[in-house]
Amino acid sequence: MDTSGNPNGYYSAHLNPESDDLWSVLPKKYPGQLTEGILEEILEIESRLSRSKKNLKDAQKENRAFLVGVYPERSVGRHPSLSMEELKELCRTAEVHVVDTFIQRKNRLDPSTVLGKGKLEEIILKAIQKHVELLVFDLELTPSQAKKISDIADIKVIDRTQLILDIFARNAKSRDGKLQVELAQLKYLKGRLTELDDNMSRLTGGIGGRGPGETKLEIGKRRVEERITRLEVELKSLKKRREINRRQRKRNELPAVGIVGYTNAGKSTFLNALTNSEILSENKLFATLDPTTRRIRFPEEREIIISDTVGFIHDLPPELSNAFKATLEELGDSDLLVHVVDVSNPDYKLQMEAVEKILEELELSHIPMIQVFNKIDNLEKFKTWKIESDSNGYKTFSHPSINHGPGLEAIADLKEELGIDVHSDTVLVSAYQGWGLKAFLDLLEEKIYNLPRLNYSIAEKL
C-alpha cells in the first residue's frame, strides 16, 4: 500500500511439494507487471503439481511408504517407538521401502481420519514431496476411515492388518496355509465391500449375476460368502487328516516337542542348528508360517519329534486369529514346549508376555517349558567372551577371566543380569553361531525323558 492507501503491488504464495518448506512465496509484483491474470498463474502451479504426480507414479514400482502411528498420550505397555520399529520390520518383510515415519500422541482419535485434518494434510504434502505412494497406519482402520483418508490423500492407504495379511499370503507354502490365509483375507474383505466402490470390478469381473436387478456389490458379497463356506469345508477336511497323522505319531510313542516364540526370534535358525536341516530362516517377520517337523536322535536309540511353528506377534488382527491358532493346534499334543526368545531385542520381555498370553488362550500354559534366550551374540557384553569347542565339537562360551571350563560362572552372572532364575529351565544360545546348543540338548534330554507320560510308557513295557 502506498501513503494514500492504494495498492502498489502484491505477493502470492502456494503449496509446493517439491520445496523443502512445502510452500513457495513468489516475488512481489507491481501494477505495471500484471501482464498475466491470476488464472494463468494458477494453471502454471497446477501444471507443476501434475509433474509431481507423474514422479509419484514412477515411484510406485519401489513401494515407497510413509508410516503413521497414532498412540495414546499415556500408553501402557510397549513404547510407540518400539511399535513403529516392528511396523518397519513388517514393511521390510513385505518388501516395502520405508521413506519416513510419523508418530503422534493423542488420546482421542478423529473418527473420520484418525489424525486431525491439518496434520493429515501435512503428511500428505510430505508424502508427495518424497514421492511416496503408500501410507501405512500402525492400527486397524475402519472401512470408512481408510476410504476417507485415501480420498483426501489420493494415494493408497493400508493398515497394519492388511500388511500382515499380505505377508501371510506371500509366505504360506502348504495347501492348508494358503487356504487359511485366503479365508482370512476374504473375511477382512467382506466387512469392507460397501466401501470399495471402483475396486468392485476386480472382485466381480466375469461373474454372472443372480438376476437382472442384482448390483455388483450384492454379487460380490454373495460370491465372497460362498467362497468362505467352501474354504471352511476344505479346511475341516484337512484338519481331520492332521488329527490322523498326530494319532499315528502318538501310537509310535515318540515324544513331541513344540518350538514357540515371537516372530523373528530365531526359531527356524535354532531348529536348523539342532537338526542340521535347511528350513527357511530369513531375518524377517513371519518367514515361517507352515509348521515344520523334524526328528532328533539321542543316545540309546531314543528319538523325539520337534516342530517349528509360526511366530507370535502383538495384537494379532482378528481376521488372522483363527488361521494363526489353527497352525498351532498341534502344540496341544506336545510333551514339552521350547520358548525361543530374542534376548537382544529391547522389547523382549513384552514379547515374552505376548507369547505367554497366546499360550494361555490356547490352553497350553500347563505344558512343561524350556526357555531359550537366543541371539546372545548380539549383546554388547557378550562380545568380550571367548568361544571354545568341547571334545564332541560343540561350541561353548566362557568369560575372558575364566581360563578353563565352559564358563558356568559367567553364564550364571549373565542370567542374573537378564533377570533369569539361575536354577530355572533356561539356556543361553546363539543359534546362528551354534553356541550353547549342547547345554540345550542336555537339558532337553533330561526334561523329556523324565516326563510322567514317558515314564509310564516305559514302565508298561517293562
Swiss-Prot record:
Matching InterPro entries: G_HFLX_dom, GTP-bd, GTP-bd_M, GTPase_HflX, GTPase_HflX_N, GTPase_HflX_N_sf, P-loop_NTPase, Small_GTP-bd
One GO cellular component, as annotated: cytoplasm
Sites binding Mg(2+) sit at S268, T288
Q: Which residues are listed for GTP binding in this entry?
A: 261-268, 286-290, 308-311, 374-377, 430-432
Q: List keywords of the entry alphabetically.
A: Cytoplasm, GTP-binding, Magnesium, Metal-binding, Nucleotide-binding
Q: What is its main location?
A: cytoplasm
Q: Where is this gene product found?
A: Cytoplasm
Top-rank taxon: Bacteria
Which GO MF terms does the UniProt record name?
GTP binding; GTPase activity; metal ion binding; ribosome binding
The Hflx-type G domain extends over 255-452
Cofactor(s), names only, from the UniProt record: Mg(2+)
Under CDD domains, the record lists: HflX (cd01878)
Oligomeric state and interaction partners are given as:
Monomer. Associates with the 50S ribosomal subunit.
Q: Report the family membership.
A: Belongs to the TRAFAC class OBG-HflX-like GTPase superfamily. HflX GTPase family.
Q: What function does this protein fulfil?
A: GTPase that associates with the 50S ribosomal subunit and may have a role during protein synthesis or ribosome biogenesis.
Protein name per the record:
GTPase HflX
Identify the taxonomic lineage of the organism of origin. Bacteria, Pseudomonadati, Spirochaetota, Spirochaetia, Leptospirales
